[in-house]
Amino acid sequence: MEASGEKAAVVRRLMEAKEVSGKTFSGIAAETGLTNVYVAQLLRRQAQLKADTVPALRAALPTLTDDLIELMMQPPFRSYHPNIVHEPAIYRLNEAVMHFGESIKEIINEEFGDGIMSAIDFYCSVDKVEGADGKDRVVVTFDGKYLPYTEQKSEHMMSRPTRKTS
């Protein structure tokens, strides 16, 4: 597990590489074929860099050092500072999900059945669009695999020895 101080130091170095490049998360995403949110997750040590993505990320952020790449390829300790929920943009995102959550859940149930949206097999992006009134709008897309709840039949429980009935 990464100590929070070590993680913060690595994140600072990764964000410096982004700053030096002069590129946005969306710009780096366009060059790497990743989503802009995933690029941000990589640079914040919330996602693991995969080997096949290294060349594209190095090209997009040429000041990334070998040791940073090596660290990025290790499974991260996915966490956040508890005070982050008080940051206004994050607070409003949380508020929106909580406010619309019950309705979203009911629509998922109607459209798919009893289940949830995965946050593991998941894609997320943030886009800027012009609204009907000509003002900027934020589009946050959550694209997660549907996972149905399963009926828990003991015969499907592989950790149990096979029972023989007489």
UniProtKB/Swiss-Prot annotation:
Q: Name one GO molecular function term.
A: DNA binding
Its source organism is: Zea mays
User: Sorted alphabetically, which Gene3D superfamilies does this protein's record hold?
Assistant: Cyanate lyase, C-terminal domain (3.30.1160.10), lambda repressor-like DNA-binding domains (1.10.260.40)
Pfam families linked to this entry: Cyanate_lyase
The record's listing under NCBIfam families reads: cynS
Top enzyme class, one word, equals lyase
Q: Which gene encodes it?
A: CYN
Does Ubl conjugation count among this protein's keywords? no
Highest classification ranks of the organism: Eukaryota, Viridiplantae, Streptophyta, Embryophyta, Tracheophyta
Its function, per the record, reads: Catalyzes the reaction of cyanate with bicarbonate to produce ammonia and carbon dioxide.
Protein name, entry field:
Cyanate hydratase
